[in-house]
Design a protein with these regions (language model features):
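Conserved alpha/beta core of the MobA/IspD/sugar-nucleotide pyrophosphorylase nucleotidyltransferase superfamily
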Residues: 168-225
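N-terminal nucleotide-binding beta1-loop-alpha1 segment
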Residues: 1-24
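Short phosphate-binding loop-to-helix
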Residues: 71-103
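A short, N-terminal amphipathic alpha-helix
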Residues: 37-53
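Acidic donor-binding segment of Leloir-type glycosyltransferases
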Residues: 52-77
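Short aromatic-hydrophobic micro-motifs that form the base-stacking/packing surface
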Residues: 105-107
Length: 225
Protein backbone atom coordinates (compact mmCIF):
# COMPACT_ATOMS: atom_id res chain seq x y z
CA UNK A 1 0.00 0.00 0.00
CA UNK A 2 1.30 3.44 -0.95
CA UNK A 3 1.72 5.76 2.01
CA UNK A 4 0.75 9.37 2.38
CA UNK A 5 3.22 11.84 0.85
CA UNK A 6 6.54 11.68 2.68
CA UNK A 7 8.26 14.57 4.39
CA UNK A 8 11.85 13.65 3.67
CA UNK A 9 14.91 15.03 5.43
CA UNK A 10 18.41 14.19 4.16
CA UNK A 11 21.26 13.56 6.58
CA UNK A 12 24.86 13.84 5.37
CA UNK A 13 27.37 12.89 8.08
CA UNK A 14 30.93 14.08 7.51
CA UNK A 15 33.85 12.62 9.42
CA UNK A 16 36.68 14.78 10.69
CA UNK A 17 38.94 15.85 7.84
CA UNK A 18 42.24 15.45 9.65
CA UNK A 19 44.04 12.62 7.87
CA UNK A 20 40.95 12.05 5.71
CA UNK A 21 41.15 9.53 2.86
CA UNK A 22 44.56 8.28 3.96
CA UNK A 23 44.56 5.59 1.27
CA UNK A 24 44.93 8.37 -1.29
CA UNK A 25 48.10 9.66 0.38
CA UNK A 26 50.34 8.21 -2.35
CA UNK A 27 48.71 10.62 -4.80
CA UNK A 28 47.31 13.55 -2.82
CA UNK A 29 48.84 15.66 -0.06
CA UNK A 30 47.05 16.08 3.27
CA UNK A 31 45.60 19.41 2.17
CA UNK A 32 44.59 18.07 -1.25
CA UNK A 33 42.76 15.18 0.39
CA UNK A 34 40.93 17.56 2.71
CA UNK A 35 39.95 19.82 -0.19
CA UNK A 36 38.86 16.81 -2.23
CA UNK A 37 36.57 15.68 0.61
CA UNK A 38 35.02 19.14 0.76
CA UNK A 39 34.47 19.22 -3.00
CA UNK A 40 32.79 15.80 -2.91
CA UNK A 41 30.55 17.14 -0.15
CA UNK A 42 29.65 20.07 -2.38
CA UNK A 43 28.68 17.67 -5.16
CA UNK A 44 26.48 15.61 -2.84
CA UNK A 45 24.80 18.71 -1.39
CA UNK A 46 24.21 20.13 -4.85
CA UNK A 47 22.42 16.93 -5.82
CA UNK A 48 20.36 16.82 -2.63
CA UNK A 49 19.36 20.47 -3.00
CA UNK A 50 18.27 19.75 -6.58
CA UNK A 51 15.99 16.92 -5.47
CA UNK A 52 12.67 18.66 -4.89
CA UNK A 53 11.12 15.90 -2.81
CA UNK A 54 13.74 16.41 -0.09
CA UNK A 55 12.39 19.04 2.29
CA UNK A 56 15.44 19.72 4.44
CA UNK A 57 19.11 18.77 4.49
CA UNK A 58 21.19 18.29 7.61
CA UNK A 59 24.98 18.05 7.64
CA UNK A 60 26.49 16.49 10.77
CA UNK A 61 30.15 17.16 11.52
CA UNK A 62 32.53 18.80 13.94
CA UNK A 63 34.80 20.31 11.28
CA UNK A 64 34.68 24.12 10.84
CA UNK A 65 35.35 23.80 7.09
CA UNK A 66 32.24 21.65 6.75
CA UNK A 67 30.24 24.30 8.62
CA UNK A 68 31.28 26.90 6.06
CA UNK A 69 30.10 24.72 3.18
CA UNK A 70 26.80 23.98 4.91
CA UNK A 71 26.23 27.70 5.34
CA UNK A 72 27.12 28.37 1.69
CA UNK A 73 24.52 25.81 0.57
CA UNK A 74 21.88 27.03 2.99
CA UNK A 75 21.54 23.69 4.77
CA UNK A 76 21.37 22.91 8.47
CA UNK A 77 24.62 22.20 10.27
CA UNK A 78 24.51 20.08 13.40
CA UNK A 79 27.73 20.01 15.36
CA UNK A 80 28.59 16.41 16.12
CA UNK A 81 28.45 16.08 19.88
CA UNK A 82 28.49 12.29 20.10
CA UNK A 83 31.53 10.14 19.44
CA UNK A 84 30.87 7.64 16.70
CA UNK A 85 29.04 7.81 13.40
CA UNK A 86 25.96 5.86 14.48
CA UNK A 87 25.47 8.04 17.54
CA UNK A 88 25.79 11.18 15.41
CA UNK A 89 23.29 9.86 12.85
CA UNK A 90 20.88 8.87 15.62
CA UNK A 91 21.08 12.36 17.07
CA UNK A 92 20.42 13.87 13.64
CA UNK A 93 17.44 11.56 13.09
CA UNK A 94 15.96 12.73 16.38
CA UNK A 95 16.43 16.34 15.28
CA UNK A 96 14.64 15.60 12.00
CA UNK A 97 11.72 13.83 13.69
CA UNK A 98 11.21 16.76 16.05
CA UNK A 99 10.80 18.97 12.98
CA UNK A 100 8.27 16.84 11.17
CA UNK A 101 10.28 14.35 9.13
CA UNK A 102 8.36 11.20 8.23
CA UNK A 103 11.36 9.76 6.36
CA UNK A 104 15.11 10.27 6.45
CA UNK A 105 17.68 9.45 3.82
CA UNK A 106 21.26 9.09 5.01
CA UNK A 107 23.95 9.70 2.40
CA UNK A 108 27.74 9.66 2.74
CA UNK A 109 29.65 12.76 1.69
CA UNK A 110 31.96 10.88 -0.69
CA UNK A 111 29.62 9.72 -3.48
CA UNK A 112 30.06 12.63 -5.94
CA UNK A 113 28.42 10.83 -8.87
CA UNK A 114 25.00 10.58 -7.23
CA UNK A 115 22.26 12.40 -9.18
CA UNK A 116 18.75 13.71 -8.44
CA UNK A 117 17.44 10.87 -10.60
CA UNK A 118 19.11 8.39 -8.25
CA UNK A 119 17.58 10.04 -5.19
CA UNK A 120 14.13 10.26 -6.75
CA UNK A 121 14.34 6.55 -7.51
CA UNK A 122 15.14 5.82 -3.87
CA UNK A 123 12.27 8.01 -2.66
CA UNK A 124 9.84 6.31 -5.04
CA UNK A 125 10.85 2.92 -3.66
CA UNK A 126 10.39 4.30 -0.16
CA UNK A 127 6.70 4.85 -0.80
CA UNK A 128 6.22 1.10 -0.42
CA UNK A 129 9.09 -0.01 1.81
CA UNK A 130 10.17 0.96 5.31
CA UNK A 131 13.84 0.62 4.40
CA UNK A 132 15.57 1.17 1.07
CA UNK A 133 19.28 0.43 1.06
CA UNK A 134 22.02 0.72 -1.56
CA UNK A 135 25.39 -0.93 -1.12
CA UNK A 136 28.93 0.22 -1.80
CA UNK A 137 30.98 -1.34 -4.62
CA UNK A 138 32.32 -3.98 -2.26
CA UNK A 139 28.80 -4.95 -1.25
CA UNK A 140 29.77 -4.45 2.39
CA UNK A 141 29.14 -0.76 3.01
CA UNK A 142 25.92 1.27 3.00
CA UNK A 143 25.94 4.16 0.54
CA UNK A 144 22.28 5.20 0.75
CA UNK A 145 19.74 4.42 3.45
CA UNK A 146 16.11 5.57 3.42
CA UNK A 147 14.05 4.91 6.53
CA UNK A 148 10.27 5.38 6.83
CA UNK A 149 9.53 6.20 9.58
CA UNK A 150 12.95 7.55 10.56
CA UNK A 151 13.19 5.14 13.51
CA UNK A 152 12.23 2.09 11.45
CA UNK A 153 15.70 0.62 11.87
CA UNK A 154 18.81 1.59 13.86
CA UNK A 155 21.99 2.28 11.92
CA UNK A 156 25.09 0.10 11.93
CA UNK A 157 27.68 2.13 10.04
CA UNK A 158 31.10 0.55 10.17
CA UNK A 159 32.38 -2.83 8.92
CA UNK A 160 29.76 -4.88 7.03
CA UNK A 161 27.07 -2.27 7.63
CA UNK A 162 25.04 -3.33 4.57
CA UNK A 163 24.45 -6.83 5.89
CA UNK A 164 23.94 -5.62 9.46
CA UNK A 165 21.24 -3.18 8.36
CA UNK A 166 19.48 -5.93 6.44
CA UNK A 167 19.73 -8.46 9.26
CA UNK A 168 18.17 -6.01 11.71
CA UNK A 169 15.39 -5.14 9.25
CA UNK A 170 14.58 -8.83 8.82
CA UNK A 171 14.57 -9.28 12.58
CA UNK A 172 12.13 -6.38 12.90
CA UNK A 173 10.06 -7.75 10.01
CA UNK A 174 9.92 -4.43 8.20
CA UNK A 175 9.57 -4.18 4.44
CA UNK A 176 12.84 -3.50 2.65
CA UNK A 177 14.36 -3.07 -0.77
CA UNK A 178 18.07 -3.65 -1.38
CA UNK A 179 19.67 -2.43 -4.58
CA UNK A 180 22.86 -1.36 -6.31
CA UNK A 181 23.66 1.63 -8.49
CA UNK A 182 27.09 2.25 -10.04
CA UNK A 183 26.91 5.96 -9.23
CA UNK A 184 25.81 5.50 -5.63
CA UNK A 185 28.19 2.59 -5.10
CA UNK A 186 31.30 4.61 -5.94
CA UNK A 187 32.57 6.09 -2.70
CA UNK A 188 36.11 7.27 -3.24
CA UNK A 189 38.62 5.79 -0.81
CA UNK A 190 41.43 4.38 -2.97
CA UNK A 191 43.41 5.35 -6.05
CA UNK A 192 41.43 2.77 -8.03
CA UNK A 193 38.20 4.43 -6.88
CA UNK A 194 39.63 7.76 -7.98
CA UNK A 195 40.45 6.38 -11.43
CA UNK A 196 36.92 5.00 -11.69
CA UNK A 197 35.51 8.40 -10.79
CA UNK A 198 37.65 10.16 -13.40
CA UNK A 199 36.63 7.62 -16.06
CA UNK A 200 32.97 8.49 -15.39
CA UNK A 201 33.77 11.84 -17.03
CA UNK A 202 31.97 13.94 -14.41
CA UNK A 203 33.74 17.07 -15.60
CA UNK A 204 31.14 19.45 -14.19
CA UNK A 205 31.51 18.15 -10.66
CA UNK A 206 33.43 20.16 -8.09
CA UNK A 207 35.53 17.12 -7.24
CA UNK A 208 36.61 16.58 -10.84
CA UNK A 209 37.45 20.25 -11.32
CA UNK A 210 39.69 20.15 -8.26
CA UNK A 211 41.56 17.12 -9.62
CA UNK A 212 42.11 18.99 -12.87
CA UNK A 213 43.14 22.25 -11.18
CA UNK A 214 45.66 20.60 -8.86
CA UNK A 215 47.24 18.45 -11.57
CA UNK A 216 46.04 15.16 -10.13
CA UNK A 217 44.62 14.19 -13.52
CA UNK A 218 48.13 14.42 -14.95
CA UNK A 219 49.46 12.27 -12.12
CA UNK A 220 46.86 9.68 -13.09
CA UNK A 221 48.04 9.87 -16.69
CA UNK A 222 44.89 11.69 -17.77
CA UNK A 223 44.82 15.02 -19.56
CA UNK A 224 41.56 16.93 -19.50
CA UNK A 225 40.44 17.87 -22.98
Amino acid sequence: MTRNPMTVFAIVPVKGLDNAKSRLSSLLTDDERKQFCLKMLEDVLRTVKSTRRIHQTVVVSRDPAVLRIAEAFGVVYLKEEKTGLNEAVSEAIGWCVERGATSVIVLPADIPLVTPTDLNRILALGEKASMVIFSSRSGKGTNALLLTPPNANPTFYGPNSFQKHIQEALKRKISLRKLRSPRIALDIDTVEDLKEFVSANAKESSAYKLLDKTGILNKLGIRDS
